[in-house]
């Protein structure tokens, strides 16, 4: 396969469950996830990551760049991007919930929206969907891939469990 260009870009999203911290065992789990899934980009939510976070993970240290958008509450976002991809035009929100960047004419995004069913939380999500994200996406590429932990609440009355093939909410 030498000399051939990779035809598929593997993009994954993973919530690290920040309340449990990011001890070395979990760092190795992230590294194994990247290896097993052959990830080119791994978007993380509930992350508090700095330049030293993965220093014990040789594969990540050698092959990935880290873009982090930490939050005061330690529930931020981060994106691990393979070193052979040229990242441009990085933009983040001020609360650690959004990372947007471009690679080779494509916009990529990592979102971690507020959770909860109370009025403040719902209003926060609506503000991201209706105002913040559209503003961040102005002048971006016409093609893109954006995802993450959107913390959208499913109304069980409108969508009974039979529609989710055993997935529990």
Task: Describe each region flagged by the PLM.
Residues 16-23, 90, 121-126:
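Short, flexible loop segments at the rims of nucleotide/cofactor-binding pockets, characterized by
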Residues 41, 47-116:
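Structured beta-strand-rich core segments of catalytic domains in phosphoester-bond hydrolases
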């Amino acid at each position: 396969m030498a000399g051939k260009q990779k035809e598929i870009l593997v993009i994954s999203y993973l919530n690290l469950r920040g309340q449990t911290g990011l001890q070395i065992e979990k760092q190795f789990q992230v590294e194994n996830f990247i290896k097993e899934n052959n990830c080119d980009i791994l978007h993380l939510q509930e992350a508090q990551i700095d330049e030293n976070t993965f220093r014990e993970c040789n594969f990540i240290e050698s092959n990935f760049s880290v873009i982090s958008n930490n939050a005061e509450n330690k529930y931020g976002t981060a994106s691990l991007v393979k070193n052979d991809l040229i990242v441009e035009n990085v933009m983040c929100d001020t609360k650690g919930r959004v990372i947007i960047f471009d690679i080779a004419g494509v916009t990529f995004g990592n979102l971690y929206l507020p959770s909860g069913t109370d009025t403040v939380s719902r209003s926060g999500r609506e503000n991201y969907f209706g105002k913040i994200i559209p503003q961040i996406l102005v002048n971006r590429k016409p093609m893109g891939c954006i995802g993450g932990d959107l913390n959208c609440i499913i109304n069980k009355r409108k969508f009974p469990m039979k529609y989710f093939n055993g997935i529990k909410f």
